[in-house]
Amino acid sequence: DYDNGYSLYIGIPFCPSTCAYCSFTSYPLGVWKNRVDDYLDALEKEIDYTAQKFYHKKLNSIYIGGGTPTTLSPAQLDRLIRKIKCSFDLKDCLEFTVEAGRPDSITREKLLALKKNGISRISVNPQTMKQQTLDIIGRHHTVDDTIQSFKLARELSFDNINMDLIMGLPEETLDDVRHTMELVKELAPDNVTIHSLAVKRAARLTIFKDRYSDMQMVNTQEHMD
């Protein structure tokens, strides 16, 4: 509804670790774990304010991103989603997405908390299916973690799963991209989002550029095709 509708984005600024390409506001959970509930306290106040300001409009979609929303515990996820459901009228909401994101943050208990609260879409984001690249960019999970997290979500009856991939990551060749796409195709996600690597000034790839200076980062039309 372009005239009377709006979409709601809620950011959870915590991650298991900081990816080398990331320039978003994100804090390592290991350091900030004891402040997550404080963040949710503040977030609930913003939710109340937003609900009051937009009460006369139709809420069409909700996206909980980050960061990594599934760094929250099952109880914290339940708290946040219940707050959203209590504060907003969701009768016109067509899609409610939670970016499960990093496979190393996904558990059965967290997925069950999402399922119980009626989340209609999740995202399981490997970025690549090449283990060497995952290690280089600081993602502390394996390719198999991605596969098992995806299969777990399917087992729990999630029928709208997105997967994010990034083209142009360090040391990735065209054959690596083909390999990633073959593995993703086997999983058969409901949609795939392809990002082209853009190195921003706040990313570790820029801040510690000497560490990555000898690494190839190539993204061509052939890769995208």
Residue ranges: model-predicted function:
Residues 26-225:
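Conserved non-cysteine loop/helix-boundary elements of the Radical SAM core domain that shape
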Residues 5-38:
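Canonical Radical SAM [4Fe-4S] cluster-binding loop centered on the CxxxCxxC motif
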